[in-house]
């Protein structure tokens, strides 16, 4: 099976499984298993997949057919041009959340050496992005759940965000300290229980009921 055949096969399998954005996801899966960029795939679409790549492809498709989030399958996802570790217990970085980061950066344009607090930090994608885009900032990431905090800690190291620090605790218990901040941002992964029934099955993996 070559790359082009694998892409078409993946696309059909995802469409049959009812995956809404099956074209986009098929492209992401092929990129993941080959390690190729979009342009490299176009130049090498007749290349045969190795046995390892075919086995990996089959495993990914099976997991996705069960509606396990693609981002969790990969173990990472891109946000604002950077790759972040993700997995069970954290909200996956989403393209529409990049708007939040943009709004924060716009707000901070007139602020020198800003002090920033990212509540319910999860993977840390927002706080770390702000830390990388504003190297003069001091960013505190506060996360209540240890499992999610581990991802934030790994991502701080991965992105070499030396001006970001992680605190594990509950802001409602005062664990954020009494420091004054120029900006407080939060994108908590909580959805009311009565709404969980009407959202996509995939999103139930990505949220915590309240």
Predicted feature descriptions by range:
Residues 34, 171, 208:
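Hydrophobic pocket-lining residues within nucleotide cofactor-binding pockets
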Residues 31-106:
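Conserved AdoMet
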Residues 98-198:
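Conserved SAM/SAH cofactor-binding pocket of Class I
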Residues 29, 187, 203:
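Conserved RecA-like P-loop NTPase ATPase core
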Residues 1-34, 38-42, 46-49:
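Non-catalytic accessory regions of SAM-dependent methyltransferases
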Residues 204-210:
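Conserved small/polar residues in nucleotide/adenosyl-binding loops
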Residues 7, 26, 57, 67-70, ...:
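A general structural signal for well-ordered alpha-helical segments in protein cores
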